[in-house]
């Protein structure tokens, strides 16, 4: 089973950017731990981060025929990007939306997601553990639903 983890804008700054909200762990440490979890579950996890919407759209397109599931923390693009939504729907690969912070406990403009209504599930508010919970949920979903 091949899974793709997508991280959007500013997530490359984890560990430096607003640690009170996003935690002190780096994206690299989150990805390393998640790869280990995926391997233990019999899956391969590929990670990709970009601050550019078009690069994320292109990487989603490249997942056709290669990835069985997608984990996506689109960052601020969650609340603005119809392009990411259309790309995810276009490839028809099951995906889980995830966030480090509870977006519903933050500013009102963060309450709207263009991705959530078509996602297998949404995990938010558990810090770095959101990634692990999203991975577990996606793997379980794929095993149950082929």
Swiss-Prot record:
Give the site residues for Transition state stabilizer.
Answer: 17
Record's catalysed reaction(s): 3-dehydroquinate = 3-dehydroshikimate + H2O
Positions of disulphide bridges: none
Keywords attached to this entry: Amino-acid biosynthesis, Aromatic amino acid biosynthesis, Lyase
Write out the residues that bind substrate. 73, 79, 86, 100-101, 110
CDD domains the UniProt entry points to: DHQase_II
InterPro entries in alphabetical order: DHquinase_II, DHquinase_II_CS, DHquinase_II_sf
EC number(s) recorded for this UniProt protein: 4.2.1.10
- Pathway membership, UniProt: Metabolic intermediate biosynthesis; chorismate biosynthesis; chorismate from D-erythrose 4-phosphate and phosphoenolpyruvate: step 3/7
* Entries under Pfam families matching the protein: DHquinase_II
Asked whether the UniProt record includes Cell membrane among its keywords, one would answer: no
Active-site residues from the entry? 22 (proton acceptor), 99 (proton donor)
Q: Top-level EC class, please?
A: lyase
Q: Which domain of life is it from?
A: Bacteria
GO biological process: any one? amino acid biosynthetic process
Assembly description: Homododecamer.
The protein's role, per its UniProt record: Catalyzes a trans-dehydration via an enolate intermediate.
Give the protein family. Answer: Belongs to the type-II 3-dehydroquinase family.
Q: What name does the UniProt record give this protein? A: 3-dehydroquinate dehydratase
Source species taxonomy: Bacteria, Bacillati, Cyanobacteriota, Cyanophyceae, Synechococcales
């Amino acid at each position: 089973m091949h899974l793709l983890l997508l991280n959007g804008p500013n997530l490359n700054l984890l560990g430096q950017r607003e640690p009170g909200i996003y935690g002190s762990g780096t994206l690299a440490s989150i990805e390393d731990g998640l790869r280990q979890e995926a391997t233990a579950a019999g899956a391969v996890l590929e990670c990709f981060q970009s601050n550019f919407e078009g690069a994320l759209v292109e990487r989603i397109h490249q997942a056709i025929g290669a990835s069985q599931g997608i984990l996506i923390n689109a960052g601020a693009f969650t609340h603005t990007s119809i392009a990411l939504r259309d790309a995810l729907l276009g490839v028809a690969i099951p995906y889980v939306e995830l966030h480090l912070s509870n977006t519903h406990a933050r500013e009102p403009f963060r309450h709207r997601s263009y991705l959530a209504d078509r996602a297998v599930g949404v995990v938010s508010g558990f810090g770095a553990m959101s990634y692990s919970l999203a991975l577990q949920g996606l793997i379980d979903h794929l095993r149950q639903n082929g």
